[in-house]
């Protein structure tokens, strides 16, 4: 693999064609090879392991807070509030971290998060430990908010790096493959994260998952910050002013309205609401069998099928547009989510969750793909973190809605929140398809 250089312009075909000066390689055409082999060559093997481990803490924080507080207090509602505080913090802090990364570079922002986030995780554990003795829930919620606000935004910032590393490919296939991989990595992290929370909480102690998240945040996020791919993305003041034509199937960014940009953000909020409601509902479902701590393990089954399906999106035909993929996948999600109301035992629930995961991955890939096409170049990091924060904020909404419903009426009522969130995704997907088509017609 050739070293990264800093003297090249980004060609057309990349959502970041005018935003980056540093891209890999020397301008020669790469030999034909498998799509995933090509992105492995672009980033280097270490990128994948480091970036995956670095994103695990964010996948553990919400359900870790839910599990910790629920285990200590016995209240699904209080656990849902703690998870909600994490999500709200991430909704506020995530885009702020992305904006800072756009302005001053990814490395200093990630290193700051690698210091602050572990400290606030420890604060959450310590304040939660005081709850049985009459400690204030407000202190736990404040610490959880800070924990979410400083959560390392590894997934979104990795996507920004990919937009630079694949900027020579005019076909967009390399970026599409990279985004499919990133969605798969996100899904696997949200499989392994909750699974680790469930295993460690059930086998050792409910505080241990968050303690592990603190260790990973301090170590692996720092490693991601120092990975050489960080040099690919230059801060906004140092970016080139040159612009090149967009791919023919991309909406012109200069004419992209904020209303159109809001659709993928709202889509990720709905996706997060689906995730949060499903997590909280599964905790209540497991509780009927005396296994509330196993919610993460149950949830991980959906993530496995979702991750595999996300990888397949790289091979879908390009004429099947991102907006159409979103609408079709969300329709399948809505139908499958209604099946959550049927199982009366764990084997049946596992089967439904596996089926439900199949359209989840492609929906996420499609929404991020639309975001990559539409986002302003100089705010790409901000917009990618905004999408990811939408997921976490939605998780807070879903947990906050489903937790009290589960406590008052049982898990079937809580699963209705999951089904409603999937239906919202369908509506937003249809709206996005219509809006993107209208925008393309106006700029044609």
Segments the model singles out, each with a brief description of its role:
Residues 93-106, 201, 308-323, 406:
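Helix-to-loop junctions at the C-terminal end of transmembrane segments
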Residues 378-409:
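A late C-terminal transmembrane helix in Major Facilitator Superfamily
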Residues 65, 152-168, 282, 362-375:
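Intracellular juxtamembrane helix-capping segments at the cytosolic ends
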Residues 76-77, 169-183, 292-293, 377-387:
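Loop-to-transmembrane helix entry/capping segments in MFS-fold secondary transporters
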Residues 115-135, 225, 332-344:
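C-terminal ends and interior cores of transmembrane alpha-helices
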Residues 143-188:
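Cytoplasmic helix-loop-helix junction between adjacent transmembrane helices
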Residues 25-91, 251, 255-300:
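Helix-loop boundary and gating motifs at the non-cytosolic
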Residues 324-367:
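C-terminal transmembrane helical hairpin of 12-TM major facilitator-type secondary transporters
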């Amino acid at each position: 693999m050739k070293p990264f250089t800093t003297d090249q312009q980004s060609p057309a075909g990349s959502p970041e064609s005018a935003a980056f000066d540093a891209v890999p390689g020397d301008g020669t055409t790469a030999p034909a090879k498998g799509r995933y082999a090509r992105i492995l060559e672009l980033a280097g093997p270490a990128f994948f392991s480091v970036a995956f481990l670095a994103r695990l803490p964010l996948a553990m924080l919400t359900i870790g807070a839910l599990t910790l507080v629920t285990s200590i207090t016995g209240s699904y509602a209080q656990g849902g509030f703690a998870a909600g505080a994490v999500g709200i913090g991430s909704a506020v802090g995530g885009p702020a971290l992305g904006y800072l990364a756009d302005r001053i570079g990814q490395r200093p922002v990630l290193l700051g998060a690698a210091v602050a986030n572990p400290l606030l995780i420890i604060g959450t554990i310590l304040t939660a430990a005081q709850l049985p003795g009459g400690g204030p829930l407000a202190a736990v919620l404040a610490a959880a908010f800070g924990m979410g606000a400083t959560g390392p935004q590894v997934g979104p910032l990795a996507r920004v790096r990919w937009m630079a590393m694949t900027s020579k490919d005019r076909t967009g296939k390399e970026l599409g493959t990279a985004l499919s991989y990133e969605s798969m990595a996100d899904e696997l992290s949200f499989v392994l994260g909750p699974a680790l929370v469930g295993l460690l909480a059930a086998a050792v102690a409910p505080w241990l998952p968050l303690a592990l998240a603190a260790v990973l945040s301090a170590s692996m996020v720092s490693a991601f910050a120092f990975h050489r791919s960080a040099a690919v993305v230059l801060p906004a003041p140092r970016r080139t002013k040159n612009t090149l034509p967009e791919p023919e199937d991309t909406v012109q960014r200069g004419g992209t309205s904020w209303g159109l940009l809001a659709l993928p953000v709202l889509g990720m909020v709905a996706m997060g609401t689906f995730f949060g409601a499903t997590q909280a509902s599964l905790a209540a479902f497991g509780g009927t069998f005396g296994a509330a701590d196993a919610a993460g393990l149950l949830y991980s089954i959906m993530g496995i099928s979702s991750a595999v399906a996300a990888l397949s999106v790289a091979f879908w035909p390009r004429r099947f547009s991102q907006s159409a993929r979103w609408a079709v996948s969300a329709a399948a999600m809505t139908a499958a989510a209604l099946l959550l109301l049927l199982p009366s035992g764990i084997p049946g629930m596992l089967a439904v969750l596996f089926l439900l995961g199949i359209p989840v991955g492609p929906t996420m890939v499609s929404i991020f793909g639309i975001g990559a096409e539409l986002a302003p170049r100089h705010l790409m990091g901000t917009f990618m973190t905004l999408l990811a924060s939408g997921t976490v904020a939605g998780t807070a909404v879903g947990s906050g809605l489903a937790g009290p419903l589960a406590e008052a009426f049982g898990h079937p009522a809580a699963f209705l929140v999951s089904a409603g969130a999937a239906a919202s995704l369908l509506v937003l997907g249809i709206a996005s398809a219509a809006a993107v088509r209208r925008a393309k017609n106006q700029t044609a």
